[in-house]
C-alpha cells in the first residue's frame, strides 16, 4: 500500500510543515501563477485541492476532470484551478516539480503523475520514489541539476505551503480532493454527475 510505504516521509513532511507554517504565514496571500485549465473570463471557477499521492485525487483527475474539460472548460463556461495540498513529502516534491514547468507542460505533468501514480509511488524507500519522480521530470525536459535545484527552491516551497495554509484556513479542508465551486465548498461524492448538477445550477 502507498500509505504504508510513505509513512516515514509523511512524518518528516508533517514536521517540516509545522515549522514552515510559522515562516510562511506572514505571506500567505501570494498565489500568483496558479496552475489553471480554461479561460480567466470563465464565469464558473472550480478550485481543486489535491495531493499527488492521494488515490482519490488520481481517480478524480482521470475520471472527472476530462469530462468537465470537454463539457464546460472548452466552451468557456468553467475554469479549473489546481491547488497543491500535499499530504506527504513525496507529494510535496511532486508539487515543487510542477511549479518548475511552464504552463503547457504543467497540465501534461498533472496527467502523467496521476495516470502513473501506482508506478512512481511504488518504490521501497523515499530515494527510489524520488528517482521515479525525477524520471517524470526528465521526460518533460528537466535534467538532474534542474530537478535538484527545483526541490531546493525556497520560493517554490513557500508558495506551495502558502496555498495549503490559505486553503486550510479559508475552506477548512480535511480531505483530498476538496472541490470549491465559485468559492463554495462542494459536499458529497465528487462524481462527474454530482459536479455537473452543481455547475448547471450556475449556468
What do the predicted segments below correspond to?
Residues 86-175, 180-193, 197-203:
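Cysteine-centric redox/oxidoreductase cores and disulfide-bonded domains
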